[in-house]
């Protein structure tokens, strides 16, 4: 908060009834009402408030340079009706801190210096009531373009000197300077101009012009300006400062012929179209805090969008996991395309439980590949020329065919909770044929069916190998060999517990 102090501080060099000169203050000193010149420099002021200057009706010159000022209150300068010179250079004043009312009561203002601040755009409404302004210095800011509205709507008919040097200007509208008919001096040096139209022909009073230290691209679009400049320098009353520095950028083949903007003509200009420049016109200034609010809203919207995307991905992965779990639990029942009992359907009683029936034939042997590769049941017709029973107890990674000695022909083996059980088909559906997943033909013959007695959980029906054991084809790379006879039920149980999970029944055997 700035203070209003009556006494003259020690840091003030001059304190008279007409002049007050101070430096390195953190406040605006309370100068006498008769003060005509108030200079406070190199201090630590953050803003200009209305209470600091409201009583200085006779003030003609106010200098607040190098104070770190960021904000100028809308009515801070309203009482300075006699002010002719306002120096605010080397501060942090931005375009958003100036309003249409900031300079509106300065009817006597002739010199306004806003050099080396943080201005990005210009609005003609700032200077609507400064009819007496003759010098406007805007050099050393961050201005990027001059549109037709930058000085439009102003009453700057008395403006003689305009300094826009050392900015970032890359675009100038064709009628940007038309509201300033009395301009005598224009400085556009040290900007980023590559192309611009002939904006100076309407300025009949122009006698000093600076365009050096830019990034001129000598295309044919620049030819009208080059023609104006050649005619301009023919008069001894006109001065084109640093004309030798109006060099073309070495970017095209035409540069070798032109070399300078002044030498550019229709015969040596580059016919290539220039790069397009996007010009953003500032329709209305953002109020203080609006930019922060806008960034907050955009950040929140982005966070919501990312959250929704994450939920969609998570839901998709969850559905995939459920599908894989369902597939694993019912792998036994999905192994075959049709029920293997011609009259029986797949049974899905509970989650993780399935019955899969396979009719046993004298002519059929069932082999199942159990391993790390995809399980694929193979049904092949028995060969009666099989090898001797000496190899009958060798188990090569796959189940041998199990022929039911005690339960008769037509019995069926099926899986329940990782155990091998026994059943029979209930009726004779007639002889049928079907293809398994391997493309082999399977024959189903009519058999009588005996209903399976109730079994307790974990019970396994004993099975033994018959005396005419048939040699099993080795169809799995995951093999192990044993050379001693063991019961069939033990083989089946051990192999199932090794290769099958507790939740899924992976294979059905005859």
Curated annotation (Swiss-Prot):
Gene name of this polypeptide: LRRC53
Entry's transmembrane regions: 294-314
Keywords associated with the record: Leucine-rich repeat, Membrane, Repeat, Transmembrane, Transmembrane helix
Protein name per Swiss-Prot or TrEMBL: Leucine-rich repeat-containing protein 53
LRR repeats: 34-55, 58-79, 82-102, 108-129, 132-153, 158-179, 182-203
GO CC field: plasma membrane
Primary location: membrane
Subcellular locations according to the entry: Membrane
Organism: Macaca fascicularis
Membrane topology category: Single-pass membrane protein
Keyword Transmembrane: yes
Domain LRRCT: 214-271
